[in-house]
């Protein structure tokens, strides 16, 4: 059975970058891929310095935002990574198969490690945990952006290595499902949209707050005057139109920009109207969840139960193939208790 898994870090409430780059696609995929699993990956959020209270609030904000954006607990499992301890168990197993050099060559590791004096081991092992996140559920498809392809290749390589070492075709080699929306640039037009850079628009922001951020946003740098013809293909605002506006509106914006019929402010005002139309229902659902927080807790609890069921079965089978079958002690009789399968593998006495 085909299975989809994807995760997102708990950065708090969603912004339009991760909404367009991932979550909007998840909402569509849950309709075509029953049983999809979507995870708030909080273990990935602790590779650097963090405040526990802030992390707790961000996990909640992300879960609420995902539900408000359209993730349906009746169609997909939404859960928090740390609620399923098997993630870290499988991650440790995979570290025994992963060459150090493969991790040091990861682009994101080289970029992030160059910005810190002391490099935490967790930063290096980040893609190993990511491989475990995916393979724990034996997912064969992973919706990702282009910046995650290298990490997914490591997961595919890990699956091949484990299968070869233990003589089993157990783990699938997950394939990428590239997000239809191209990489979303920040409002400054210089880098990827990111909360840490302050170049985002939050999904829960009001109509006025959206306009306040769109007004100074970067457009075509060569269009200095309103009478100058524009180049929509290099304008970040036009890319947002393609994500939020109707096709006929996008075509109108393209023509008005190229002919200098509209100025950039005209274009931005139309974009704001398109964004408000799509985001207002999401804000409304988020407000309803704020009023009934138990709905968020129930969704996460149900998702975690589903995820744990799959994860436990995977780890039971993985341990068996690896010779790590569980051994327990029956305290009442003080005798060794184990499965018949384990006993049958014990070496006979000389």
Predicted regions and their residues:
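N-terminal Rossmann-like or analogous alpha/beta NTP/dinucleotide-binding catalytic cores
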Residues: 2-132, 283, 287
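Conserved nucleotide- and phosphate/pyrophosphate-binding catalytic cores
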Residues: 16, 150, 156-335
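A generic secondary-structure signal for well-formed alpha-helical elements
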Residues: 63, 70, 98-101, 139, ...
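Short helix-capping/linker segments at secondary-structure and domain boundaries
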Residues: 100-104, 136-143, 245-253, 283
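Internal, conserved structured core segments that host functional sites
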Residues: 116-162, 185
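Single conserved hydrophobic/aromatic residue that forms the stacking wall/gate
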Residues: 332, 336-350
């Amino acid at each position: 059975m085909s299975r989809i898994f994807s995760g997102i870090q708990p950065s708090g409430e969603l912004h339009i970058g991760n909404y367009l780059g991932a979550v909007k696609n998840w909402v569509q995929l849950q309709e075509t891929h029953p049983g999809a699993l979507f995870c708030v990956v909080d273990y990935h959020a602790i590779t650097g310095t963090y405040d526990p209270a802030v992390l707790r609030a961000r996990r909640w904000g992300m879960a609420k935002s995902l539900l408000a954006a359209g993730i349906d607990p009746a169609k997909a499992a939404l859960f928090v990574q740390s609620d399923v301890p098997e993630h870290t168990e499988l991650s440790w197993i995979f570290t025994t198969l992963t060459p150090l050099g493969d991790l040091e060559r990861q682009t994101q590791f080289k970029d992030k490690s160059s910005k810190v004096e002391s490099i935490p081991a967790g930063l290096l092992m980040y893609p190993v945990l990511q491989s475990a996140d995916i393979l724990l559920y034996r997912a064969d498809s992973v919706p990702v952006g282009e910046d995650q392809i290298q990490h997914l290749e490591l997961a595919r390589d890990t699956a091949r290595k484990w299968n070869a070492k233990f003589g089993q075709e157990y783990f699938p080699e997950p394939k990428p499902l590239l997000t239809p929306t191209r990489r979303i640039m920040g409002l400054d037009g210089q880098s990827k949209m990111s909360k840490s850079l302050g170049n985002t628009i939050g999904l829960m922001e009001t109509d006025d707050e959206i306009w306040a951020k769109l007004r100074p946003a970067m457009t075509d740098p060569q269009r200095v005057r309103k009478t100058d013809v524009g180049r929509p293909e290099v304008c970040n605002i036009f890319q947002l139109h393609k994500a939020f506006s109707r096709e006929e509106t996008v075509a109108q914006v393209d023509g008005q920009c190229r002919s200098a019929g509209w100025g950039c402010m005209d274009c931005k005002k139309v974009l704001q109207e398109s964004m408000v139309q799509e985001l207002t229902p999401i804000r409304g659902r988020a407000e309803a969840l704020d009023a009934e927080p138990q709905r968020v807790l129930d969704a996460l609890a149900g998702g975690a139960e589903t995820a744990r069921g799959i994860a436990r079965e995977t780890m039971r089978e993985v341990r068996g193939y690896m010779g790590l079958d569980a051994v327990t002690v029956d305290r009442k009789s003080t005798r060794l208790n184990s499965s018949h399968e384990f006993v049958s593998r014990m070496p006979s006495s000389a």
